[in-house]
Amino acid sequence: MGAASCEDEELEFKLVFGEEKEPPPLGPGGPGEELDSEDTPPCCRLALGEPLPYGAAPIGIPRPPPPRPGMHSPPPRPAPSPGTWESQPARSVRLGGPGGNAGGAGGGRVLECPSIRITSISPTPDPPTSLEDTSETWGDGSPRDYPPPEGFGGYREAGGQGGGAFFSPSPGSSSLSSWSFFSDASDEAALYAACDEVESELNEAASRFGLSSPLPSPRASPRPWTPEDPWSLYGPSSGGRAPEDSWLLLSAPGPVPASPRPASPCGKRRYSSSGTPSSASPALSRRGSLGEEGPEPPPPPPLPLVRDPSSPGPFDYVGAPPTESIPQKTRRTSSEQAVALPRSEEPPSCNGKLPSGTEDSVAAPGALRKEVAGMDYLAVPSPLAWSKARIGGHSPIFRTSALPPLDWPLPSQYEQLELRIEVQPRAHHRAHYETEGSRGAVKAAPGGHPVVKLLGYSEKPLTLQMFIGTADERSLRPHAFYQVHRITGKMVATASYEAVVSGTKVLEMTLLPENNMAANIDCAGILKLRNSDIELRKGETDIGRKNTRVRLVFRVHVPQGGGKVVSVQAASVPIECSQRSAQELPQVETYSPSACSVRGGEELVLTGSNFLPDSKVVFIERGPDGKLQWEEEAAVNRLQSSEVTLTLTIPEYSNKRVSRPVQVYFYVSNGRRKRSPTQSFKFLPVVFKEEPLPDSSLRGFPSTSGPPFGPDVDFSPPRPPYPSYPHEDPAYETPYLSEGFGYSTPALYPQTGPPPSYRSGLRMFPETGGTTGCARLPSVSFLPRPFPGDQYGGQGSSFALGLPFSPPAPFRPPLPSSPPLEDPFHPQSAIHPLPPEGYNEVGPGYTPGEGASEQEKARGGYSSGFRDSVPIQGITLEEVSEIIGRDLSGFPARPGEEPPA
């Protein structure tokens, strides 16, 4: 902080503000003329070491120009007058000799002093009153260019009101900080007087600027507010001075002791001159708290010159209500701080009152703070303490005085108690509107009405509650668009009455022990509410036309003693309540069987609802493109049918030659546009039945004449394969007769070894000696194998294959060769003759892969099957049997036809 430290020199200063214009004339001297020290009032003739008399009249100061906009001041610059400088917020001080002309060359030097913000308050009872009286010293008679804020007369000087202050109580928000030129080298008495002059006014302001002070925020100042402005919120009023200011009043002339904090208020002033310090919370200040600075020093003794708090001061504005001009932000901040008071480190107040010793001095601010806190803010409620039942698995045990709400999830069974719906309602029910008559009670699927029973309790009658619940994927809750409707009449056997629980209509019935705690629900209908009434409710997001499925929800509270009950609940199957249900669409719930042979003729029983005497059952099949390919109506047995069951005969499928199951569909029709949803059904291929062979492990084709095997047939496991085994020849890949027969070819090698061994499970025929033939036949493979001796296949003997037709002309059964039929279910199975020793030549009739082993052939994908017609991967035993039986029964003989290559 700049200072002028010159002995026996007289200090004179001039304040120059923003605009570069000459100040108005001060007197006869004209502009720029300096006053002699003799004519200068004592308050402006500040000789170092000489105290300033309090009663002196101040010198007239030129009226300042309008304030410059902006948050920061420009740097110092030379002023038109010689020896002066212009600066904001700095002040230029011209030092000259005693009585010398300030304008003389070399008469003094210019020191630039920055703006000093005074933090002390004067104890003088009244400031100088001659300032406002000498209005001619201001040039135009107006005290300031800055009018005080509306509704607050004490924030700025009010001319004409005695007791107006010469000093602005907010140095940071006023551009005329008159006493800001003091330096550390100034006279202690002068500093004492000046500081106490300001302190008296600041204390008066602080006494009313508490937590909920009615004074406006410093942000309402004409000058733009900056974070450095010291007028932040103060603490509650108290009688002592701030500890950082007390040294100004107690120190003697000499070195000034250091302050524990900066001299600028910076929002840390919390006390006024009206009582003892109060217990302030650390949260009351934005920049610090008393708790951060250690113990508070004892308050100083009272000074002789203290303003009476009851006397009007410059900050007292009689005509303004206390809270008219308080900005909302000020009150909101005060409310926040007031709410935080109980968390203070110091003893909290009791019942909203401050500690003893402060009630008299701050009763009004305290009451105002309490009122504002109640108006602006609501106390945050404590967290809800959920019961253990809601936290841990929805326990169904409740108090009788606190039954669960209707949307509370409840189990249907708890320990030995169980609420069960013995008879479910139908899947459709036409709900009625409020403007139309009743549609009757909800009916059950097999006829009658739903039945509900409580198991595990039969001590005394209980009340059964029923309401309409939702049927969507969300949790079960009361339906917004449907409510239960009480049905009465001579045909209704169950007594009931309606009740309303949380806005939901509930139907209550009685479960009697003499009825085994069961109730026939013949008194409950469904009422449809108007969509617009529900959709316009606050917070309702569901749409009525998309929520037409409901459930019947039943609930019972079983007493357990000790004021406890166990609540169990059961919900029915979904019920469609849309108007389409008025068409009584048929519904299929179960049916048996689900598959049948393509020949049909079996009996099919359907179970469902809404079946009529003239209901039809139609089977259909659609192609991959969705087009209808087959449609057939089944014959319904009317004598064995009812409203809930239909008995019919499955029709015959259109294609009986299918080799794999066929998926079709059927539906029940009660007339035009009254069809049930389609149900799937499967037609299976015809199964060719085979007679068992003498050996239970062998099954083959029956023959019409002669025993099928000779005595020399060996059924031992097959020998290891030999290189010339023919596996890829198409003759081995055709398991059934389809096109024709092949012809014999010359033998590859003679039979010299023992009889061939047969693999178990093969369809085998005996062979006789002769030549070996190999031809590509689509249906059957004639592989003559020589036998050393065969009672059926010897020379001139003939073995009948059991075929329903004669072989072609080139085929001669008496030849010493008879064809074996390869097993279609064992791809690598065949009748293996033993090749001659050392024979390794591959015959011309075999393909290149014939010499591979069985394991290699299996890995390579070689297999017998229907490679020309049906893939082998999806073939089944039933399909193969059906195909073989079909071809054997209807295959025409084609003599002389050459098999395909």
Swiss-Prot record:
Motif (Nuclear localization signal): 268-270, 672-674
Cellular component GO terms held in the UniProt record: cytoplasm; cytosol; nuclear speck; nucleus; transcription regulator complex
Gene ablation phenotype (knockout): No visible phenotype. However, adult mutant animals show selective impairment in the formation of spatial long-term memory and long-term potentiation. They exhibit a reduced number of hippocampal adult-born neurons compared to wild-type littermates. Simultaneous knockout of NFATC3 and NFATC4 results in embryonic death soon after 10.5 dpc. Embryos appear normal at 9.5 dpc. At 10.5 dpc, they exhibit defects in cardiac development, including dilated thin translucent hearts, pericardial effusion and anemia.
Residues forming coiled coils: none
Ranges for region Calcineurin-binding: 114-119
Keyword entries, A-Z: Activator, Cytoplasm, Developmental protein, Differentiation, DNA-binding, Isopeptide bond, Nucleus, Phosphoprotein, Repeat, Transcription, Transcription regulation, Ubl conjugation
Predominant cellular place of this UniProt entry's protein: cytoplasm
Record field: compositional bias (Pro residues): 61-81, 215-227, 254-263
Post-translational changes noted in the entry: Phosphorylated by NFATC-kinases; dephosphorylated by calcineurin/PPP3CA. Phosphorylated on Ser-168 and Ser-170 by MTOR, IRAK1, MAPK7/ERK5 and MAPK14/p38, on Ser-213 and Ser-217 by MAPK8 and MAPK9, and on Ser-289 and Ser-344 by RPS6KA3. Phosphorylated by GSK3B. Phosphorylation by GSK3B markedly increases NFATC4 ubiquitination. Phosphorylation by MAPK8/JNK1, MAPK9/JNK2 and RPS6KA3 may stimulate NFATC4 transcriptional activity. Phosphorylation at Ser-168 and Ser-170 is stimulated by UV irradiation.
Residue span of region 2 approximate SP repeats: 213-293
MF (Gene Ontology): DNA-binding transcription factor activity; DNA-binding transcription factor activity, RNA polymerase II-specific; DNA-binding transcription repressor activity, RNA polymerase II-specific; RNA polymerase II cis-regulatory region sequence-specific DNA binding; transcription cis-regulatory region binding
Sites of Phosphoserine modification: 168, 170, 213, 217, 289, 334, 344
GO biological process: brain-derived neurotrophic factor receptor signaling pathway; branching involved in blood vessel morphogenesis; calcineurin-NFAT signaling cascade; cellular respiration; cellular response to lithium ion; cellular response to UV; dendrite morphogenesis; heart development
Low complexity composition-biased segments: 114-123, 166-179, 272-288
Induction (free text): Up-regulated by BDNF. Induced by calcineurin in ventricular tissue.
Tissue: Widely expressed. In the brain, expressed in neurons. Expressed in the hippocampus (at protein level). In the hippocampus, expressed in both the CA1-CA3 pyramidal cells and the dentate gyrus granular cells. Expressed in a subset of hippocampal cells representing adult-born neurons (at protein level). Expressed in the submandibular gland (at protein level). In the olfactory system, expressed at low levels in the glomerular and granular layers and in the mitral cell layer. In the cerebellum, expressed at moderate levels in granular neurons.
Residue spans binding DNA: 430-437
SMART domains: IPT
Keyword Phosphoprotein: yes
Bias (Gly residues): 96-109, 151-165
Function: Ca(2+)-regulated transcription factor that is involved in several processes, including the development and function of the immune, cardiovascular, musculoskeletal, and nervous systems. Involved in T-cell activation, stimulating the transcription of cytokine genes, including that of IL2 and IL4. Following JAK/STAT signaling activation and as part of a complex with NFATC3 and STAT3, binds to the alpha-beta E4 promoter region of CRYAB and activates transcription in cardiomyocytes. Along with NFATC3, involved in embryonic heart development.
Record text on subunit structure and interactions: Member of the multicomponent NFATC transcription complex that consists of at least two components, a pre-existing cytoplasmic component NFATC2 and an inducible nuclear component NFATC1. Other NFAT proteins, such as NFATC3, or members of the activating protein-1 (AP-1) family and MAF can also bind the complex. NFAT proteins can bind DNA as monomers or dimers. Component of a promoter-binding complex composed of STAT3, NFATC3 and NFATC4; complex formation is enhanced by calcineurin. Interacts with CREBBP; this interaction potentiates transcription activation.
Domain-related comment: Rel similarity domain (RSD) or Rel homology domain (RHD) allows DNA-binding and cooperative interactions with AP-1 factors.
Name of the protein: Nuclear factor of activated T-cells, cytoplasmic 4
Organism of derivation: Mus musculus
